[in-house]
Amino acid sequence: MGACAPLDTVGNEPDNGCSTAEDSGVVRTIRLIGAPTDINSSFLRGPAKAPPVIRAALYSDMGNRAAECGLEFGRDYLLEDAGDLPLSEAAGDDERITAAIHAACSAGAVPLVLGGDHAISYPVLQAIHAHHGAVEILHIDAHPDLYHALDGNPRSHASPFARIMEAGLARRLVQVGIRTLNAEQRAQVARFGVEVVPMRDFTPDAVPPFAAPLYISIDLDGFDPACAPGVSHHEPGGLTTRQVLDVLARIAAPIVGADVVELNPLRDLNGMTAMLAAKLVKELAARMVRNGPVAAPDTRKRAMANCP
């Protein structure tokens, strides 16, 4: 299947074994939103080219639509593709990103954003905060992205979580896979009370449980370069695909949004990292559906009893 037109709904037929969005209010719509910008990248450009590459992998005949839990987009939940935002490396780009997230949340959809570099997480979370208040964040990355202003740029892709924490958009930040924690960022960790699971200490059990509302941000350079060569910043000694999937599978808290960022197609090998990003989209979307909305625990429990 080719990439969908803007606001195309991928599949709306009911599943015989699991309630649909219309009849239960639990299986929801996930809205894909491309944020093709890398203006705040500090080393290499390229992530702006990623959203259509991720879509091509997602809809490719190389795989199918199922997540590992058994839920399939187009069968068990609706996947809307809002296309790529018309970003122009101008001051208004953050406002365009925020407006798109506002629109998704207002429509009852859960936004799943395709970067782009990691700087996009800040405007995304500004809109998430307006709808859900301060969130808990699971941030998977090689880098803490807590610089006050890398190279004098406070909007650098190395600084989004400093802006997020300063603005009070998160009540808790848990960072997993970190392996580049220098003196400045150690001070920022202490300042903001960040919970860090460094790569050298990683096990799935080391990742704490989360409460709703939860936002998940996955920087593909959190993976070992052997799993994700298509990133700008290779940092050896990282997470495997299975380790990250195990972390996601343990999450029970309702998820109000997510992003997958920092794919650089210019560095990828045979589409390996694009396929990884596409798999993460399927796994995140299915986890959003299975964990249900923030405010309907009883309904969610009944519906999930009928799902795989």
Predicted regions mapped to residue ranges:
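Conserved alpha-helical scaffold segments that buttress catalytic/binding sites
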Residues: 2-6, 14-308
